[in-house]
């Protein structure tokens, strides 16, 4: 189980680059002007030698310069005492990330309920649709996010559902090793509960199987550790 957790942690780090990153004593500090928690947090990737108190203080100082809260991503492979250290400094649990996996060798390919347009390359149309569905109006985010998607170092599957000329649903599949990760699932509010999300996921999985994927994973973010600062869930 631990080996699979480690694999998915590695895959998810590959899948979603940040605007900028910094390596600090076995930690990765990720910066994206707080577009999402995942792209604007501290992740542990290796052993440390600097005292923990000093490392946390350093991270807080760096993120304060960016004008964003200090967020630490916690995974099941980490020492549970780290949670306590953070709580002693005033941190609290803000979101939980549920990770679901699927054995694609046992998955029965089915035709999606709704037609889905797939592309291997990102397009301005897909990005504008994503921004519209997420309500992204921050000019810095609209400037840096396209480069973050284009920096994904793996093969990609961009999915869109249209109503006329308008994108009403998006999704993204990222192929890495024998896995496909499903990301960026968004559906316009007035079109929800009409199987659009299911159609997007099935289309991505079907395409990934054609590319040789044997495992799928989906991360639904609802929890990270954050300092007591103003914040906005993306």
Regions found by a protein language model. Name each.
Residues 26-31, 99, 160, 166-174, ...:
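Conserved beta-strand in the GNAT
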Residues 225-234:
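Single conserved hydrophobic/aromatic residue that forms the stacking wall/gate
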Residues 1-65, 78-79, 83, 139-140, ...:
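N-terminal charged segments
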Residues 15-18, 67-68, 82, 96, ...:
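A short helix-loop-beta-strand connector motif used in the catalytic cores of GNAT acetyltransferases and
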Residues 66-74, 209-220:
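Conserved GNAT acetyl-CoA-binding A-motif
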Residues 1-10, 38, 43-44, 97, ...:
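Short amphipathic alpha-helix that is part of the acyltransferase structural core
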Residues 43-49, 185-192:
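A short, internal acetyl-CoA/4′-phosphopantetheine-binding micro-motif in the GNAT/acyltransferase core
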Residues 54-59, 193-206:
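Conserved acetyl-CoA-binding loop-helix of GNAT-fold acetyltransferases
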């Amino acid at each position: 189980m631990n080996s699979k957790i480690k694999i998915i942690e590695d895959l998810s780090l590959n899948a979603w680059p940040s605007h900028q990153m910094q390596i600090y004593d076995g930690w990765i500090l990720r910066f994206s002007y707080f577009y999402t928690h995942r792209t604007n947090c501290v992740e542990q990737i290796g052993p440390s030698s600097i005292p923990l108190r000093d490392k946390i203080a350093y991270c807080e100082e760096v993120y304060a310069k960016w004008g964003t809260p200090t967020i630490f991503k916690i995974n099941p492979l980490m020492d549970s005492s780290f949670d306590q250290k953070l709580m002693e400094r005033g941190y609290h649990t803000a979101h939980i990330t549920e990770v679901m996996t699927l054995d694609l060798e046992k998955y029965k390919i089915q035709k999606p309920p709704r037609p889905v347009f797939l592309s291997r390359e990102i397009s301005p149309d897909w990005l504008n649709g994503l921004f519209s569905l997420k309500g992204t109006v921050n000019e810095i985010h609209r400037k840096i996010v396209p480069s973050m998607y284009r920096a994904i170092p793996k093969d990609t599957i961009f999915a869109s559902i249209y109503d006329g000329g308008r994108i009403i649903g998006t999704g993204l599949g990222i192929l890495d090793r024998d896995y496909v990760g499903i990301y960026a699932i968004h559906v316009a509010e007035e079109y929800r509960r009409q199987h659009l999300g299911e159609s997007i996921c099935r289309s991505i999985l079907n395409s990934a199987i054609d590319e040789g994927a044997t495992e799928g994973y989906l991360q639904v973010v609802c929890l990270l550790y954050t300092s007591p600062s103003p914040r906005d869930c993306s």
